[in-house]
Design a protein with these regions (language model features):
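Alpha-helical transmembrane segments in inner-membrane proteins
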Residues: 1-352
């Protein structure tokens, strides 16, 4: 009975977070260069659902265009990317048993960045179609994930420390190659695109893009949620897991590959946005503890709320100018992480 009541309380907490996410979406819809009253937003949403017209259809009014074509796609993308990066942070930290781990430290984001940089400045993969930059970013993340797994398996079976070291080494290599390409590139327009992309932006979100990204990120998060028992065993270590009948070797590899899928699409859609996968799990673990059955859904919802609110702030902090979201996240994330590092130990949910 006590566990049942405990589960009911946790479900209520998730419901509260879901409501907060909806409220943050509504708030972010209303702010910007053009402020929209709540009534106008409600009318635009209701009209779209009752009219039966395609979202992209012209002649539906300026409020409809602002809500459905400009703001709502980017806010949904912000929620998806925030949830995906926060969830990947949880997974990375479990894989290497280190709360400082995130997709960046294991080289996945750097691989995606190298792929996108090669596509934009060198035209690599242009034959793949108009979305070749995104495809190149995903391929870069996926290839680096495979390389991390390959290197960590050299000289015997991989473990969390070998994965961490392999990821850090490959991250440095990808960064060096990206810098090399940028340094010798003679493409001013491409350089501007890279600079803007490296700072992170959600402005280019499209409904067609969301139709591809949303199922992948949501399905991956739900899959990881079903793996809570294995993720909890990873915190105990390989020897303890083996005595309990679970070999973690294959699980680590699959989790890393699925995480690369999320990160590849996130980097393709929103550019380089750091700290979400590092800060959000670190903070949430203080409240939920290390149990991934609770940690994962809370981290996903909080990550979504965090990025939606950040995107809203980016549009109003500087009048008539949109601040790149990666800059704002770094300005918030870096001092927050330093504070957490001083106040808390690096244990999974532990404190001084």
């Amino acid at each position: 009975m006590k566990n049942y009541l405990k589960d009911i309380g946790f479900a209520a907490f998730l419901l509260v977070l879901a409501v907060l996410l909806l409220l943050s979406l509504f708030w972010a819809l209303s702010i910007g260069t053009v402020k929209l009253p709540a009534g106008d937003i409600y009318d635009a949403v209701l009209h779209q659902f009752t009219s039966g017209m395609p979202i992209e259809a012209t002649g539906q009014g300026p409020v409809h265009d602002i809500v459905w074509l400009l703001r709502l796609p980017r806010l949904i993308l912000a929620a998806l990317v925030g949830a995906g990066l926060a969830s990947c942070g949880v997974i990375m930290q479990a894989i290497v048993k280190n709360p400082l781990a995130d997709p960046y430290i294991l080289g996945i984001s750097s691989g995606a960045s190298l792929g996108a940089t090669s596509a934009i400045l060198l035209g690599v993969g242009a034959a793949l179609g108009p979305n070749f930059v995104g495809i190149a970013a995903f391929i870069g993340a996926f290839v680096i994930s495979l390389a991390v797994l390959f290197i960590s398996n050299l000289g015997g079976r991989s473990n969390s420390m070998k994965l961490l070291l392999a990821g850090m080494a490959l991250s440095a290599v990808c960064g060096a190659f990206s810098s090399f390409i940028v340094y010798f590139a003679n493409n001013k327009e491409g350089m501007q695109t890279i600079a803007y992309w490296m700072m992170g932006s959600l402005a280019g979100a499209q409904w067609g893009e969301l139709a591809v990204i949303a199922p992948i990120i949501v399905a991956s998060i739900l899959f990881f949620w079903t793996q809570s028992r294995v993720l909890n065993l990873m915190l105990l270590g390989d020897e303890s897991a083996i005595t309990m009948g679970t070999d973690l070797h294959a699980y680590r590899q699959w989790y890393l590959l699925i995480s690369s899928l999320i990160v590849g699409f996130a980097v393709y859609s929103a550019g380089m946005i750091g700290f979400v996968g590092l800060i959000v799990p670190h903070v949430i673990r203080m409240f939920t503890g290390p149990d991934h059955k609770r940690l994962l859904p809370v981290a996903a919802l909080v990550g979504a709320i965090f990025l939606v609110v950040a995107d809203g702030l980016c549009r109003v902090i500087i009048p008539h100018t949109e601040l790149p979201i990666g800059i704002l996240i770094s300005m918030i994330g870096a001092p927050s992480f330093i504070y957490l590092m001083i106040k808390k130990t690096y244990g999974f949910g532990g404190s001084d």
